[in-house]
From Swiss-Prot:
SUPFAM superfamilies: Thiamin phosphate synthase. The gene is thiE. The lineage of its organism: Bacteria, Bacillati, Bacillota, Bacilli, Lactobacillales. It catalyses: 2-[(2R,5Z)-2-carboxy-4-methylthiazol-5(2H)-ylidene]ethyl phosphate + 4-amino-2-methyl-5-(diphosphooxymethyl)pyrimidine + 2 H(+) = thiamine phosphate + CO2 + diphosphate; 2-(2-carboxy-4-methylthiazol-5-yl)ethyl phosphate + 4-amino-2-methyl-5-(diphosphooxymethyl)pyrimidine + 2 H(+) = thiamine phosphate + CO2 + diphosphate; 4-methyl-5-(2-phosphooxyethyl)-thiazole + 4-amino-2-methyl-5-(diphosphooxymethyl)pyrimidine + H(+) = thiamine phosphate + diphosphate. It comes from Lactococcus lactis subsp. cremoris (strain MG1363). Its cofactor is Mg(2+). The keyword Protein biosynthesis does not apply. This is Thiamine-phosphate synthase. Binds 1 Mg(2+) ion per subunit.
């Protein structure tokens, strides 16, 4: 496996729990449609999803990985190193309370992308020399998509924090269509979104809008 180029511009995060009114199969189909709508990265994050058995989870992850591959979308697994290894995923994304970047790197090797979440200036500074390939910073705004989200950073502080950053980085948390313009002009390499795409009537249009904003100012 050779490490691919990672286009972070339209970074989609979702699992079946983000379509709570749907069955697992229906939710998987909805996620697949969004993956094919023009996103550049898909992160399989299924926290809160209840499976009848573990092999059902693996089957869904494999289906979404295949859809991602066919769409030319990088497939990232959230937190679960063993699943990422079993799938030979393009990458793994971890948080501050998970294993260290160095320990995860030992397990997944150099070929797999390794992303790290940061929520404040101190974490961002430490992350620069952590060995992570890219960072996810947020929440930028208040968000309902994650129950355990940290205090929102705000656009003013985020702008200052990004001056100290040297790594590829995506912003996340409470992003709406109305905030795309101000976010596109502060030095982010991409925007990571959940509800902006899962609740969109036209995901393709939204994905295109995000990409245009980011690449225009990139």
């Amino acid at each position: 496996m050779t490490k691919k180029t990672l286009d972070l511009s339209v970074y989609f995060i979702a699992g079946s729990q983000n379509f709570s009114e749907c069955s697992l199969d229906e939710a998987t189909q909805k996620i697949a449609l969004i993956i094919k709508s023009g996103v550049t990265v898909y992160q399989f994050r299924d926290k809160g999803t209840i499976y009848k058995e573990q092999k059902q989870r693996l089957s869904i992850a494999q289906k979404l990985q295949k859809v991602s591959e066919e769409a030319g979308v990088s497939f990232i697994v959230n937190d679960d190193v063993e699943l990422a290894r079993e799938l030979n995923a393009d990458g793994i994304h971890i948080g501050q309370t998970d294993e260290s970047v160095s320990k995860v790197r030992e397990k997944v090797g150099q070929e797999m992308w390794l992303g790290l979440s940061v929520t404040n200036a101190d974490e961002l500074k430490t992350a620069q020399s952590s060995g992570a390939d890219y960072l996810g910073i947020g929440p930028i705004y208040p968000t309902n998509s994650k129950n355990d989200a940290a205090k929102p950073i705000g656009i003013k502080d985020l702008r200052l924090m990004l001056l100290e950053n040297q790594l590829p980085i995506v912003g996340i948390g409470g992003i709406t269509q109305d905030s795309l313009t101000e976010l596109s002009a502060i030095g982010l390499d991409g925007l990571a979104v959940i509800s902006l795409l899962t609740e969109a009537e036209n995901p393709k249009k939204v994905a295109q809008m995000i990409r245009q904003k980011i690449t225009k100012n990139g």
